[in-house]
Amino acid sequence: MKPRPGEIVAVVAGLDVSPGRLAAMRATFTAREAARFVSFAHEEHRNRWGAARGALREVLGAALGQAPADVEIRYGPHGKPYVDGLRFNLSHSGARALIALSVDCEVGADIELPRERRRTDDIARRFFTAGEIARLFASVDRKAEFFRLWCCKEAFLKATGEGLSRSTRSYEIEFTASGARLLWANGIPDAATRYSVFPLDPGDGYRAAVVAEGGGLKTRLVRWP
């Protein structure tokens, strides 16, 4: 499970777990995580959040050689979580979670379950760059392309650790024959060579992406458990 140097491990976990497994996951939570779990009013949202957090602790524990309950998760200045000895990022949508792992570079992950009712054209005009909009509107399957791009852009924000403090129109991503690439990012002169973008196919209709700080990287997709 632990990534090799120069490798990004992308772990896909199902979130509709049995009551027994969810109870075992909850037993690994900190007081802060337990409070967050019970704060959800909707049972499905509560259980899926708990399963995502539990899967994260299981995966981190497996990679670090620790029990899930012993993994100490800390938070950076922009709220990005981290642990000693491993870089990671978590995203979840619908009934799936995506966990990106690395031993030597910052990573960001995003997974999305495309929703038919979302007004994707309006969202694109608001949040994408002019170049991204032009390529999106020229694509054959505009809705599918929208979610592919959305995942890549979200993953970049999470890789930099800036989150919502950076505008989604302050950087541009382009799809290529072999995947995707970052063209530019305001405030990061070497952005195009500094970050690698990896669109992923997690299956079951989901879209996903991982962005990592570094070049010459490889990805490995893993199903959990």
Language model features: what each stretch is:
Residues 1-225:
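Core catalytic alpha/beta fold that binds nucleotide/phospho-ligands
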